[in-house]
Amino acid sequence: YKGQLRTSADQSWAVDASVFTHRDSLYLVWFGIPEQPIPYIFNCIYIARLENPWTLATRPVMIGIPDQRWERHDPEAAFSMGSPQPLKSPDGNLIHLVYSAGGNRPPYSALGLMTAQSGSNLLDPASWKKSPQPVFCQNDTLGVFGPEHCSFIKSPDGTEDYIFYHARYRLEPAANDLRTPRLQKFSWDKKGFPVFGQPIPCHVKQPKPSGTAI
């Protein structure tokens, strides 16, 4: 244990951080409350370069604010985007951040995408471009509701990509106890953007990840 990773002097809200390496530098992304209040905005996405795994080397920079229409659906909550997870394109030319937004409950919650060119300044908000629509939404027909809070892993042999996320099997808005972890394979388009498809219900059998020993 090395100590608390402080993102601000006043220890304000900073949640669901993730790290990634780019051009020999270590970066931290997370979501938190803006230093200066923004009407109807609760959480935004931040980035900073790290001096080491427990110390920021730069001041936090806000790179994402919930300003898309689909991110502002929930009529009973302050607008929020969070849980950013880094994902590099197969050729390394793009750095994606996949994030949760739309409210922390179905039917609004979904995954969005922010993208930067690998040669850009990742600490410049202008480097990040948002997808205008969510990239992973609930599947009403098959009964998968409110997908959010994802991460990414490879198959054992490294040839396949998988998204790991949680979702609900019923539509009750506040039923966090109904959330279950899900795993499914995804692909890439020719431009280096992830193609997640639709959430798959838990009862649907899927092929084992390539290289699985059992």
Where do the PLM segments sit?
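Carbohydrate-active catalytic/glycan-binding domains of CAZyme proteins
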Residues: 1-214
